[in-house]
Amino acid sequence: MDKARHQQLFQHSMEPGYRNETVPQPFMPDQTGSASANMRPPNSNGSDVKAVHNFSIQTGEEFSLEFMRDRVIPQRSSNPNGAGDMNYNTGYMELRGLIGISHTGSECASDVSRFSTVENGTSDIERTNSSLHEFGNKLNHVQSAPQALLSKDSSVGNLHGYKNTSSSASGSVTAKVKILCSFGGKILPRPGDSKLRYVGGETHIISIRKDISWQELRQKILEIYYQTRVVKYQLPGEDLDALVSVSSEEDLQNMLEEYNEMENRGGSQKLRMFLFSISDMDDALLGVNKNDGDSEFQYVVAVNGMDIGSGKNSTLLGLDSSSANNLAELDVRNTEGINTIAGDVVGVGASQLMVNGFQQTSAQQSESIPPSSSLHYSQSIPLNAAYQLQQSVPPSSALHYPQSITPGSSLQYPQSITPGSSYQYPQSIIPGSASSYGIYPQYYGHVVQHGERERFPLYPDHSSNYSAIGETTSSIPIQGHVSQQGGWAEGYPYPGSTPKSTQALAEEQKVSSDMKIREEVEPENRKTPGNDHQNPPQIDDVEVRNHNQVREMAVATTPPSQDAHLLPPSRDPRQNTTAKPATYRDAVITGQVPLSGIEDQLSTSSSTYAPVHSDSESNLIDLNYPEPEQSSQRVYCSERIPREQLELLNRLSKSDNSLSSQFVTSESPANTAQQDSGKEAVGKSHDEFKTVNDDANHHTHKDVETIFEKVGVSDETLESEPLHKIVNPDDANKNRVVNGADTEIGVSNLSHVNAAMSHVIPEEQASLQGDILIDINDRFPRDFLSEIFSQAISEDTSTVRPYPHDGAAVSMNVQNHDRKNWSYFQQLAEDQFIQRDVVLDQADSRIPSDRKDGGESSRLPYVSPLSRDGISTNLANPQLTLGQDYGGNFSEKDGGGTGSIPPALENEQMKVTESEEFGAMVENLRTPDSEPKDEKTETRHAALPPLGSEFDYSGLQIIKNEDLEELRELGSGTFGTVYHGKWRGSDVAIKRIKKSCFAGRSSEQERLTGEFWGEAEILSKLHHPNVVAFYGVVKDGPGGTLATVTEYMVDGSLRHVLVRKDRHLDRRKRLIIAMDAAFGMEYLHSKNTVHFDLKCDNLLVNLKDPSRPICKVGDFGLSKIKRNTLVSGGVRGTLPWMAPELLNGSSSKVSEKVDVFSFGIVLWEILTGEEPYANMHYGAIIGGIVNNTLRPTIPGFCDDEWRTLMEECWAPNPMARPSFTEIAGRLRVMSSAATSTQSKPSAHRASK
């Protein structure tokens, strides 16, 4: 609006005939009374409006105070104006309408609309004065708007920023669009009918120009709701699960076209636009009651666009306040990778945050430590911090509640924090420690209620040198064994102590030699009420502490409102005494601190503060007792963040860690078998377990009492070696990967601690002791594992109990020793492929390799087979950078080609088992592959082998389609359809492969085509009586599709036979079938071929001979092309057979022993005829397998030989599993014994 218009506007308003005469002025009062376009608000005091001549643009004079007060504060009913309009509202409401403020009574500054439309079309008013938004952000409520906006430098014209548009008044109405705009709420199912509806938030009607650009709309949206990250709109008549995203000019034009079409059709409905922030999505996740059912939960997750547990959902934009003073509040946020992690191991010097575009330096020490195994937590536990804290416990809080703390490797840590808070931890390796359980990054920390922002001080050591939580804090060791205690006043130091300054405390921090963390402190941000000591700033949602190998123990406190009765009672009489101040169980931790494996499942609480405790109680054991007492089974710690009480209770049934709280039991303490902490370790004195690194531990070792669980493991498999054999921490980390990738061998990362060998075998090395070395990169699609984990971490499996430990099985309830490095479950947006019926293929998964040397090897159309020594020449070496995902904060660049094992034969009678529960998530991850647009191009690529390929296709038989006859369909899926047919009179299985398997960019098409022909060529060379024969390829199928022709097995899959009531298989036949399968797998492994999907569905049988059934291995080839189309179906149908090392991310390499694990489950299937874990959700299955707390229940009628073989096959440690050669030999012996036993009674009857 230029100056001339201002002058014209106010000159007209001051003319004598302004009130009663009809003059051609743009701001003539609206005769309809619907809205006033007059510049001056009407008089509401009932008196005649006098012409005001004391305001002028030229003179700068202002209106009188009475004039403004009468028009701002609605006191009386409006009276007719001079023109006889009886419909005027009060001056307050008039002003609200003029400046575009909604009538909803919102106090949000962003309610101020940028446009206001006069319904009668007499004027087109636009706000152009930027000061309105500037002042608007400072408003607390609408009533103060005029006062805030009327500064001494503002004229009335400038105040509202209107321009004269009378010349185009008629066109201005049609050039505007009114749409509903909702923000601040979330989409949730309505209780009862589960119909989705938008809950909470605000809804306004906004007006935008039809020619508005996307950038202008974005600016307007940010003025309305500055936290907006996602814009979607809803077409009238559509449900909330059909929202349309707007992210570009084209999307905006489409939305406006939809508006035009709707306007042409008539009706009163309006387009509705939704503005979502990241915190909105996360709040929706927290608000979902998982008890309502998995499918409903998945649905809500998908509709809200939530990436469960993902750091992508965490943002600084979700903060209630983003001021620099609330630094701790910002500390736990992560804005799309801006939040960097301090630590040399990831190449970052300090923890820094970006707050609304301004860089802030974290005042907190950024430390990171992976969970350590049970044999090594003396490295990380403060030596004399615990007992001194216990001595200072006030009498009012003398109860000690054991928290089921098992040795460190049994502890689980929350994988995700809260919506909008995701402090990410690098994969730092502490000397002699590594992850045995838990996902990188692990979240430990001090959980503070959202909105209430309580302060929880930490108490680092015994010398009364305490630090508030916002300062550079000491860590609570992950392996610390603590009991709970409450009752300290919030915000104050431990009784009898005086806080120490941040700088002084920082000087006392001792960090291990290989983890130099830079500390950056901002004391000015910390104020302690009532004293001059520093205290933490306000914390939103969660205060997270990285835990490096620091030698102090931090103890948080909870407010007095935390009820002591919510804590589990102690069952160990020793727990209720303070006589043993030197033991770790005397350490006290209170508050919402889900540390050291504490499961904070608060099911009933009248307080918003949730004390951290576990459903399962453990009696902590120290080595002063010759025979350790029994500890509970496994204790997992999942993050529970109390927000509002209802959301807290809803949250309790969920875990943000697929490895945590999946199987928390509420039973009395029981034995826990652990692989690494052998019986010898329990009885050893703590001097054997002390750390030699005195620089990292300034306390004396004599104060340490190491706590171990009782181990129920057989002596021959679990032998232990004292940890003092490893002296130099660097010796334990020699496999460290540059740039913070998978650091390998901590002392606790032991696959075997074998006393006979007198050295430590690292996990990476131990897991690769098979004949074949497979790079998982070649088998799993990138987001196959990561997405099922992101779904599984939210599953409600608290009612699932671990497989009972009956003392006979080594593999029951043993801890898994693989590192839970989830760095490769990071950037999931590239391929978006999910495996079904997974012949697990992952050429594009880019799982981090363990090579230190850089470089990328070119990706081949088909990966080369491995040599017999199991060493691939094409290992990928992805370089890792800090990422955004909570799963490990590492995003991988494109890796090179990967070495793999040539896959073999594809089963032709595939049994299609579509998983409905997985479909909702998958469909929101990617759209199903559509049919190729250019069918000629696609057909040419698919039907012809690639030129210049390294494979020789001359030996591959090409079968003409006209020679085939399809008889009946056996099954179908996203991969294709299988038919029973005839090939020149012989029974065959024909698998028609969909063209969508080869869809994609030209380079992708070429790669997939090469993979198909390369695998087909290999399959044609596999010949064994217990392997399904591969006959050839059909390249001239209908529409140019490809097909494979394989041997047909009359009775189909073994699973089908087992469930048939008319088929009875005695023990001898079952042994024969198992033996045949073992022979077939032995042959495949001899050809460097790993199946990856061995199960009864993929074992084909022929039972025509009643005395000798025949079993053949199938469905293990052509796996790569499945990756593009295998969605939603096979995850649930394949997980029970997957080995832990395939799921836990411990290494990018696995051995052929993954098939041995699957075979153990197959033996159980053959024995029972049932499907493993039939009634369990796949999330529970994942957690159980990875934690090694879940195996099929062995029936009582199982004989010892079969039981032992099964348990050895599904042992957690790949090295402990037998080879198929050994398995086949043992089954042969068992079969011979069964045959002789069966023949003896027959001979006896014949002699009679």
Swiss-Prot record:
One of its GO terms (molecular function) is protein serine/threonine kinase activity. Residues 964-1229 form the Protein kinase domain. Keywords: ATP-binding, Auxin signaling pathway, Cytoplasm, Kinase, Nucleotide-binding, Phosphoprotein, Serine/threonine-protein kinase, Transferase. This is RAF-like serine/threonine-protein kinase 20. The modification Phosphothreonine is found at residue 1125. ATP binds at residues 970-978, 991, 995. The lineage of its organism: Eukaryota, Viridiplantae, Streptophyta, Embryophyta, Tracheophyta. The gene is RAF20. Its EC number is 2.7.11.1. It holds the Pfam family PB1. It comes from Arabidopsis thaliana.
